[in-house]
Amino acid sequence: MKQTVYIASPESQQIHVWNLNHEGALTLTQVVDVPGQVQPMVVSPDKRYLYVGVRPEFRVLAYRIAPDDGALTFAAESALPGSPTHISTDHQGQFVFVGSYNAGNVSVTRLEDGLPVGVVDVVEGLDGCHSANISPDNRTLWVPALKQDRICLFTVSDDGHLVAQDPAEVTTVEGAGPRHMVFHPNEQYAYCVNELNSSVDVWELKDPHGNIECVQTLDMMPENFSDTRWAADIHITPDGRHLYACDRTASLITVFSVSEDGSVLSKEGFQPTETQPRGFNVDHSGKYLIAAGQKSHHISVYEIVGEEGLLHEKGRYAVGQGPMWVVVNAH
């Protein structure tokens, strides 16, 4: 398995393309100059394209991925109804979902043969919309509205329209600020990092019809932490055993172990990391974690070790200015 790591640096308007080897070392293979401030990125389900959101001219760009070395070639673009904060796709590669924090909306862009061809639906009134996350069964779109302390739930129709479910939302505690999410591989649990109180909620998916319950909330910060809480990103290993979340004020990654059924998180430790880590990701082998420092302009690679999933630094690399997004593609 070959793996390519993509790093989006909006301040220098670049994507750095790296080869990740089996020992956790990175080799720079390409630097792509992007026509705009590049932020969120996602790889298409068939691994043929990288979709990126850019500003200040709000667009989704599609880059063709070379199957041998992961190099990028521009392929297409499509306008968006708001500044892109988060980007994702459905599991069949039919639609791109874009959440916009500033516009307070989520949009659906249709794909034809992997290329974006236009927006087919927009839902407004999602104050502080920070991500759009398709459920494992490809039926439900989870959309955290950070400023409203709620996660809105939509059914995705065959033509890409979003239909509010019943119930149409679940709520967090007041002032939590739900932001980014991941799903357990067993498809029974979801985990949401809350930006404003730096906590992680565990949501049980009781059935595919919106019957969802928060079964655990964990503070992700050290006991003596008294500064402003400012959580950012969350990721889980492919085997579902280890979960990670980061806080930008403390510049640390919190390490959680996950119970076998996915229902319980246990805090295992903290890893100091790059300054203001807004984005990170876990590789497809579950052996390495790559974190980007928005203020350090570097990335660090960590090996995931032991039953606790603690992080051991393997290497550090300069990237573009203000790196914000990390994506790993296996090919």
UniProtKB/Swiss-Prot annotation:
Name of the top EC class for this enzyme: hydrolase
Superkingdom: Bacteria
Residues carrying N6-acetyllysine: K287
One GO cellular component, as annotated: cytosol
Keyword Hydrolase: yes
Keywords annotated in UniProt: Acetylation, Carbohydrate metabolism, Glucose metabolism, Hydrolase
The EC number(s) this enzyme carries: 3.1.1.31
Protein's UniProt keywords contain Membrane: no
Catalytic reaction annotation: 6-phospho-D-glucono-1,5-lactone + H2O = 6-phospho-D-gluconate + H(+)
UniProt GO molecular function: 6-phosphogluconolactonase activity
Gene3D superfamilies recorded: YVTN repeat-like/Quinoprotein amine dehydrogenase
Pathway it works in: Carbohydrate degradation; pentose phosphate pathway; D-ribulose 5-phosphate from D-glucose 6-phosphate (oxidative stage): step 2/3
Database matches in InterPro entries: 6-phosphogluconolactonase_YbhE, Cycloisomerase_2, Lactonase_7-beta_prop, N2O_reductase_N, WD40/YVTN_repeat-like_dom_sf
Record-level GO BP terms: glucose metabolic process; pentose-phosphate shunt, oxidative branch
Family, similarity comment: Belongs to the cycloisomerase 2 family.
Described function: Catalyzes the hydrolysis of 6-phosphogluconolactone to 6-phosphogluconate.
Name of this chain's protein: 6-phosphogluconolactonase
Taxon lineage: Bacteria, Pseudomonadati, Pseudomonadota, Gammaproteobacteria, Enterobacterales
